[in-house]
Amino acid sequence: MSDIALTVSMLALVAVLGLWIGNWRIYGVGLGIGGVLFGGIIVGHVAHQYQIQLNDDMLHVIQEFGLILFVYTIGIQVGPGFFSSLRVSGLRLNAFALLTVFLGSVVTVMLHKLLNIPLPIILGIFSGAVTNTPSLGAGQQILTDLGSSTALVNQMGTGYAMAYPLGICGILLVMWLMRVLFRVAVDNEAKQFETSNGQHHEQLLTINVSVTNTNLQGLAIQDVPILNRDTIVCSRLKRGDELMVPSPHTLIQLGDYLHLVGAKNDLEQARLVIGNEVETSLSTRGTDLHVERVVVTNEKVLGRKIRELNLKQNYDVVISRLNRAGVELVASNQASLQFGDILNLVGRKTAIDAVADIVGNAQQKLQQVQMLPVFIGIGLGVLLGSVPLMVPGFPVALRLGLAGGPLVVALVLGRIGSIGKLHWFMPPSANLALRELGIVLFLSVVGLKSGGDFVDTLLNGDGVWWIGYGALITIVPLLAVGILARTLGKMNYLTLCGMLAGSMTDPPALAFANGLHPTSGAAALSYATVYPLAMFLRIMSPQLLAVLFLTL
């Protein structure tokens, strides 16, 4: 059998075994995608026993490409809401991530000083315990630059391999302990995130208001400040028995009924100004008005603001809501359209059909994946990750690496949405498929590489102690920060899990957190919020520790 056929066959075996292990449930909790790592360790051990040799270069390429696929699709998924998340809660989330990194470094220093663990070993255990491969590379590089022998530098890799599996299990254990300790109901946490935080947007509501304020008599809608905001849309007006779609120039009369869409606080302010909330129906049923949802797929309208389309003036149609990446937004005049946006239209049937033709409404396009933008994004991400970042006082340049670079680029491209005919929108099913494929490839190779020496070091060497040290470095900071964030910070459980996974730059942990509630984006959003800073700190920390240990 050729090297390629053998390697692919082994990876397939690892994936099948690992996914099967991941489906096991103990008290309702399983390893999920993390089971692939243990499938890899088992197959790697058997391959080592029977002296089955796999191509290391090929495995390395598959491992890195799998990681790139995973982080890129995560970035595309959370990109539309990432920057608003950063403004709203980014400081708090990154502060907790910083605390996690700091506490892990403190535990590492204590173990090194109290137990006299050799420097390469403790740095390797530290990198494995926090499941950060770039940290391992940075530590090995600085040890080499500081004059350590090749044998000592290689010991760091051994320590990493011993600590890595329990590093992944440790964070999953902490997530499970947090769930048990605080009696978390995951479905309730997801609902709380969607309603209270509204994906960092307030949930949109509707009310019907009767105009009783005499000061509004004869004023155009655009002349009423509360109705001229970007936070409220007046999508219907009923006068007598006539239901109409109002324009900014429509004159208000006493006794008119207005159908308003907006956030709770904005609607309450509008009610206080306009009049009284009423139960009178402003339904389009039985009238010549219709409400339909159409999707934006026409390249000609991408990037254009809603006001530029002049839908009300030209077609007597109002956009009452805009759904972007699952988030309901007020369709303000300043909002720019992106590929995949879903518009809630109110108007006459023929007019809505005309507007649908303008914005595209080609449902089949949403199921198509443009591969050109995918590889453009990956290529740009790899280039960004390879750019050296020189920090004064450090003997080596820092880099975002093959994980950080594609993530940052994907976040930016996901936020932009489209450039010309290139759309970075990806159907959820396609995004999930690529993401799962990436993480399975990555974990399969990590497991295969660790499996060869894992059992021997565990049974005949100091492996058990190394695993124990790694467990302390993994669990103590995560548990401390998790309890602090939940009790004092009142952090949503799914957001907390994503933040913990991001602070460890741990894709398998994120996959596990996403699996807790597959339809909620809370974990992925908080992961992406803290990941860039956490990756930078994880790369810096072993270098700082090496300098610290050698100078004290």
UniProtKB/Swiss-Prot annotation:
Membrane-protein topology: Multi-pass membrane protein
All residue ranges annotated as the RCK C-terminal domain in the record: 191-276, 279-361
GO molecular function: monoatomic cation transmembrane transporter activity
Record's keyword annotation contains Thylakoid: no
GO biological process: potassium ion transport
Keywords assigned: Cell membrane, Membrane, Repeat, Transmembrane, Transmembrane helix, Transport
GO CC annotation terms, alphabetical: plasma membrane
Regions crossing the membrane: 4-24, 26-46, 65-85, 90-112, 158-178, 371-391, 393-413, 439-459, 464-484, 493-513, 530-550
Pfam families found in the cross-reference section: Asp-Al_Ex, TrkA_C
Compartments, record wording: Cell membrane
Matching InterPro entries: AAE_transporter, RCK_C, RCK_C_sf, Transpt_YidE_put, YidE_YbjL
HAMAP family on file: YidE (MF_01016)
UniProt similarity note: Belongs to the AAE transporter (TC 2.A.81) family. YidE subfamily.
Protein name as catalogued: Putative transport protein ECA4401
Lineage: Bacteria, Pseudomonadati, Pseudomonadota, Gammaproteobacteria, Enterobacterales
